[in-house]
Regions:
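Conserved core segment of the aminotransferase class I/II
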Residues: 1-44, 48
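Thr-Gly-centered strand-to-loop micro-motif
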Residues: 7, 20, 73-74, 105-108, ...
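Glycine- and other small-residue-rich loops at beta-strand/loop junctions that grip anionic moieties
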Residues: 22, 29, 47, 84-85, ...
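A general structural signal for well-ordered alpha-helical segments in protein cores
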Residues: 27-30, 37, 55, 59, ...
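PLP-dependent enzyme catalytic core of the Aspartate aminotransferase-like
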Residues: 29, 118-164
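Structural signature of PLP-dependent enzymes
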Residues: 37-60, 70-79
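Active-site pocket-lining segment
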Residues: 65, 72-82, 95-101
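Conserved C-terminal alpha-helix-loop-beta "cap" of PLP-dependent enzymes
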Residues: 83-135
Length: 164
């Protein structure tokens, strides 16, 4: 911390550390966080491989069923758990509106509202129709193959119904 920098306390109370921190640290939570970080680090490589396999499975199913579907960043290194695809001729928000059971985002992570053109997708040379059709999907540590297959089916059905 730079000398003379005035920081406002986030939690008010006791005046620990010159009034910046209130109360006593929660030692059990700190130890728990350390243990969680240790467990996560031990399984990270294996988890990344598993999530990439699920991401690729979802990508393959969507690409095989939807003509003109575009994978954003598919030819470069990308996160093992994230798939960004652009659905042709249909706005992503319309697809997601039909799928309340699905948690996904439109556009890129930089503009999750989908209300403005994503600078990330624009920098990749993507046009407004491409951006409007983009959905970002993520797998988690506990995502199953059955869940991926179900999501693929839901997305394909929604796109088919909307694209007419």
């Amino acid at each position: 911390m730079r000398r003379g920098l005035a920081l406002e306390s986030l939690i008010h109370g006791a005046g620990h550390e010159n009034g910046i921190r209130a109360g006593t640290e929660n030692t059990p939570y700190i130890v728990g966080l350390g243990q969680a970080a240790h467990l996560a680090a031990n399984g990270l490589d294996e988890s990344a491989v598993g999530m990439a396999r699920l991401r690729d499975r979802l990508e393959k199913q969507l690409c095989e069923a939807i003509p003109g579907l575009k994978v954003n960043g598919g030819s470069v290194d990308r996160l093992p758990n994230t798939l960004s695809v652009s659905f042709p001729k249909v706005a992503a928000r319309d697809i997601l509106a039909r799928l309340p059971e699905l948690c996904a985002s439109t556009g890129s992570a930089c503009h999750s509202t989908g209300q403005v053109e994503s600078a990330t997708l624009a920098a990749m040379g993507k046009g407004i129709d491409h951006v409007a059709g983009t959905i970002r999907l993520s797998c988690g540590w506990y995502t199953s193959q059955d869940e991926v297959d179900r999501v693929a089916g839901l997305l394909i059905d929604a796109w088919e119904n909307l694209s007419g």
